[in-house]
């Protein structure tokens, strides 16, 4: 929509522009100051400036357009091209509620399909058929390598006592076309109420859960094997007490028992007591340095108060020292004792 706006001055006019021939975009109003002159003239962000005071702005550079606007006399006449505003009935480019509802339903279907793609497929090892499915009737034999060890371990007499949640399982067997061994297939699990009322014990074999009666031979055999594999556990304190009692019964020397059975108290005294840290000795006063020490050379240390010039007694901590023979001097007195100053050896 083309319109003309007269902004009453003087400058500043209260708006900003962007674009230009150097940016390959038309000159556009990007910001209008609140309660400013441009806002009073109904200038809005997004308006495209076609001409400035009658001069076409199509081929103007950005800096050129800025200069013409700033130097323009009052009033500033701008010919604008204002884009049409979206109607209130439009939302996200759609003009009706029916189209929006259709898009919402399609998005829900897409979300459902994505969740369904994550569910196990019939060829997946995690796929299980429902109890009422005609593809897996009760008592059907399924050949699986994970059940073969359990199928070989069950004898005909003990397999009759196999229960699943308190219900006797079917004992049908057959061979698959691939030649796998037949295994026992159980009926689907009962309701939670029936499962809680039945007395059973869960036994894990090859990663699959089965239920056996407590008076069956298979349960007793598995229980004996489990108890045989379990190693006896004994606490360290009880073991020490047992060794002490056995040594006393044999008439030997009683074993050493720590008072609080703590590992620290059982250590020898020579190891428990740490040796005191080695202290440096000040070479000037020949006393031990307990706190801070100043290292002059390898194996030579002094107190901070003893680190002074041998002539004037000036502290050399922030100045550094100079060697003259075997004494430390400040720079002033070291130069007085040297005939050749370039041979000074300064150590900070």
UniProtKB/Swiss-Prot annotation:
It comes from the Eukaryota. Residues 193-202, 257-270 have a biased composition (Low complexity). GO terms for cellular component: adherens junction; filamentous actin; stress fiber; Z disc. It is found in: Cytoplasm; Cytoplasm, Cytoskeleton. Residues 280-340 form the LIM zinc-binding domain. The keyword Metal-binding applies. Residues 67-139, 165-202, 249-275 are annotated as: Disordered. The modification Phosphothreonine is found at residues 128, 132. Residues 1-84 form the PDZ domain. One of its GO terms (molecular function) is muscle alpha-actinin binding. It holds the Pfam family LIM. Residues 103-118 have a biased composition (Polar residues). The keyword Mitochondrion does not apply. The modification Phosphoserine is found at residues 117, 119, 124, 133, 153, 191, 197-198, 202, 209, 262. Keywords: Cytoplasm, Cytoskeleton, LIM domain, Metal-binding, Phosphoprotein, Zinc. One of its GO terms (biological process) is actin cytoskeleton organization. Interacts with alpha-actinins ACTN1 and ACTN4, FLNA and MYH9. Interacts (via LIM zinc-binding domain) with MKRN2. Probable adapter protein located at the actin cytoskeleton that promotes cell attachment. Necessary for the migratory capacity of epithelial cells. Overexpression enhances cell adhesion to collagen and fibronectin and suppresses anchorage independent growth. May contribute to tumor cell migratory capacity. This is PDZ and LIM domain protein 2. The lineage of its organism: Eukaryota, Metazoa, Chordata, Craniata, Vertebrata. The gene is PDLIM2.
């Amino acid at each position: 929509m083309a319109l003309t706006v007269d902004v009453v001055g003087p400058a500043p006019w209260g708006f900003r522009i962007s674009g230009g021939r150097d940016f390959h975009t038309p000159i556009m109003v990007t910001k209008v100051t609140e309660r400013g002159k441009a806002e009073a003239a109904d200038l809005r962000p997004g308006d495209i400036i076609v001409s400035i005071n009658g001069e076409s702005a199509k081929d103007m550079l950005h800096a050129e357009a800025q200069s013409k606007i700033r130097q323009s006399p009052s009033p500033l006449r701008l010919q604008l091209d204002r884009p049409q505003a979206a109607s209130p009935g439009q939302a996200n480019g759609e003009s009706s509620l029916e189209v929006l509802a259709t898009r919402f339903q399609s998005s829900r279907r897409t979300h459902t399909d994505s969740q369904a793609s994550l569910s196990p497929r019939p060829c997946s090892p995690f796929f299980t058929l429902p109890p009422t499915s005609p593809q897996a009737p009760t008592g059907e034999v399924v050949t699986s390598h994970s059940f073969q060890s359990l199928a070989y371990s069950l004898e005909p007499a003990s397999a009759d006592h196999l229960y699943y949640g308190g219900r006797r399982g079917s004992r049908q067997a057959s061979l698959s076309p691939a030649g796998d061994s037949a295994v026992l297939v159980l009926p689907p699990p009962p309701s939670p109420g029936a499962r809680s009322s039945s007395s059973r014990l869960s036994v894990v074999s090859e990663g699959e859960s089965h239920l056996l009666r407590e008076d069956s031979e298979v349960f007793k055999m598995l229980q004996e094997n489990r108890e045989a594999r379990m190693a006896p556990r004994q606490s360290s304190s009880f073991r020490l007490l047992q060794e002490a009692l056995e040594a006393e019964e044999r008439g030997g020397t009683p074993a050493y028992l720590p008072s609080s059975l703590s590992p620290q108290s059982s250590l020898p005294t020579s190891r428990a007591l740490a040796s005191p840290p080695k202290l440096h000795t000040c070479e000037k006063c020949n006393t031990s340095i307990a706190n801070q020490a100043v290292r002059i050379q390898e194996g030579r240390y002094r107190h901070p108060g003893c680190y002074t010039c041998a002539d004037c007694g000036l502290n050399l901590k922030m100045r550094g020292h100079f060697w003259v023979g075997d004494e430390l001097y400040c720079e002033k007195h070291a130069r007085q004792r040297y005939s050749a100053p370039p041979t000074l050896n300064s150590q900070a």
